[in-house]
UniProtKB/Swiss-Prot annotation:
Glycans are attached at residues 108, 191, 260, 373, 411, 496. Ca(2+) binds at residues 40, 80, 311-312. It comes from Mus musculus (Mouse). It holds the Pfam family Sulfatase. This is Arylsulfatase K. The modification 3-oxoalanine (Cys) is found at residue 80.
């Protein structure tokens, strides 16, 4: 009975009139509260059919029923820090020069939360933020800086699973649960006479660290308990199709090799990795649920806009990879759901959107004028009354999104233009590495590159991409940045830099022939700068390269 009452109350509250219009800006004390929950590594395709059938996600389903789901939401860079830099700045990656997990925004950069605070909002952040420069391990930095070197070294542990055989163990990711508890306690203490904006960053469902003798543990363990694994429908798990190693795009082969995924995997191994990942997503959903339940108990749900998203997705063995760092759907397609006053219920939006849209949307919710030259666009015109505003939405924003990647585990800067049925992926200088073109309406698994089959479409999309970003120039800048940063680091550690590298994540491969790899680095350092992808010299195996119940426990 309680659940029915809660569902009815929430449904009525969430169908309330829009909190503002374009014609009249609200006073801050009339503005709604905002809660943004951002997880890590969550595949956005799990938030709608058919992906949502594989695992029970009751609170995401609640948001779907009482709010708006964006069916085609994308990260602007499929790796943690650059993606979050885009979300917090509202700018594309090449504009903030957030090239890798070490290089993000300046710590003093003015974010949307800073602006909302200046306009009277109470603000608070808990958990993983990760949008500023200077973080992550030495391994992560050196791997990104040396991706242009002509060698091939495994940088990650082979993906594995680890099960806690306890049907009652709900709190597996302890740190995330602790941050969720802190966020809820803050909600209990906040001054309700003023609007607030709360951010909760979760590390789940990012894979866990794996045992390693290197400087930094690789994060290749999919870890959960029997409690969460029972939320997964094993029969619904799809085993992804793989191209042979010789058929793979050269950048994909490099990524698969550095991620230690070119070896043999049984179908059972692949299915278990995917099942454990989905179980980790279920635990993530439960933390989102604790926030929603707390808002309800505090009589704040009908006054608060709740947003859920993620920095990027998770490959989970699609295209013979785990992690992200790729432009395939599993890596770049993120969840984006919103519910609250003025947001249409049970709406699915097919338009392409991306994380740079968070910045202008947050300010628009608060009735704050948007700064000029943002890369993103507010989503509110579409959310308040989709049928009336969809055409205006399309008129005011372009029908494409941009994603780019410049970090480790890929040996070329990568650029994705997503528009309509098409996904176009360009690399490096646009000439040295073959592009990719996928028709997602016919090839949702992205197994057939039709770039050469449809040269006119490929050319048109490439020209559009170049009108958005001069990607050959950006690639050259990243190449030069990588070289300069590596030289500075090499000088800082002295003549024994090879011994330092020998104890990073790629230590096992490096120690087999350190002289060979030192020579490759020296050749790279003395060669003329070029954004071209490297040609690995190491031989490899294979050819080429109602509100649900709480689950907090």
């Amino acid at each position: 009975m309680l659940l029915l009452l809660v569902s009815v109350v929430a449904a009525l509250a969430l169908a309330a009139p829009a909190p503002r219009t374009q014609k009249k800006r609200m006073q801050v004390n009339q503005a709604p509260n905002v809660v943004l929950v951002a997880s890590d590594s969550f595949d956005g395709r799990l938030t709608f059919q058919p992906g949502s059938q594989v695992v029970k996600l009751p609170f995401i389903n609640f948001m779907r029923a009482h709010g708006t789901t964006f069916l085609n939401a994308y990260t602007n860079s499929p790796i943690c820090c650059p993606s979050r830099a885009a979300m917090w700045s509202g700018l594309f990656t090449h504009l903030t020069e957030s090239w890798n997990n070490f290089k993000g925004l300046d710590p003093n950069y003015t974010t949307w939360m800073d602006i909302m605070e200046k306009h009277g909002y109470q603000t608070q952040k808990f958990g993983k933020v990760d949008y500023t420069s200077g973080h992550h391990s030495i391994s992560n930095r050196v791997e990104a800086w040396t991706r242009d070197v002509a060698f091939l070294l495994r940088q990650e542990g082979r993906p594995i699973i680890n099960l806690i055989p306890d049907k009652n163990r709900r709190r597996v990711m302890t740190k995330d649960w602790q941050n969720t508890d802190k966020a809820i306690e803050w909600l209990r203490q906040v001054n309700y006479t003023k609007p607030f904006v709360l951010y909760l960053g979760l590390n789940l469902p990012h894979p866990y660290p794996s045992p390693s003798s290197g400087e930094n543990f690789g994060s290749s363990t999919f870890h959960t308990s029997l409690y969460w694994l029972e939320k997964v429908a094993y029969d619904a798990i799809k085993i992804p199709k793989w191209l042979t190693l010789s058929q793979m795009h050269p950048v994909d082969f490099y990524s698969s090799y550095t991620k230690n995924c070119t070896g043999k995997f049984t179908e059972n191994e692949i299915k278990n990795i995917r099942a454990f990942y989905y179980a980790m997503c279920a635990e993530t959903d439960a933390m989102l649920g604790e926030i929603i339940l707390a808002l309800h108990k505090l009589d704040l749900l009908q006054k608060t806009i709740v947003i859920y998203t993620s920095d990027h997705g998770e490959m989970a063995m699609e295209h013979r990879q785990f992690y992200k760092m790729s432009m395939y759907e599993a890596s770049v397609h993120v969840p984006l759901l919103m519910m609250g006053p003025g947001i249409k219920a049970n709406l699915q939006v097919p338009s392409v959107v991306s994380l740079v849209d968070i910045y202008p949307t947050m300010l628009d919710i608060a009735g704050i004028a948007l700064p000029p030259n943002l890369s993103g666009y507010s989503l509110l015109t579409l959310l308040s009354n989709a049928s009336a505003n969809e055409q205006a939405f399309k008129f005011h924003r372009p029908p494409w999104i941009l994603s780019e990647f410049h970090g480790c585990n890929a040996n070329a800067s990568t650029y994705m233009l997503r528009t309509g049925q098409w996904k176009y992926i360009a690399y490096a200088d646009g000439a040295s590495v073959q592009p990719q073109l996928f028709d997602l309406s016919l090839d949702p698994d992205e197994l057939t590159n039709i770039a050469t089959e449809f040269p006119e479409i490929t050319y048109s999309l490439d020209q559009k991409l170049r009108s958005i970003v001069n990607y050959p120039k950006v690639s050259a800048s990243v190449h030069q940045y990588n070289k300069e940063q590596f030289i500075m680091w090499k000088q800082s550690v002295g003549q024994n830099y090879s011994n330092v590298i020998a104890h990073l994540r790629w230590h096992q491969d490096w120690q087999r022939d350190p002289r060979k790899y030192e020579n490759a680095i020296q050749h790279w350092l003395t060669a003329h700068s070029s954004p071209l992808a490297s040609s690995p010299t190491q031989s490899t195996s294979g050819s080429q390269p109602t509100l649900p119940q709480s689950t907090s426990g």
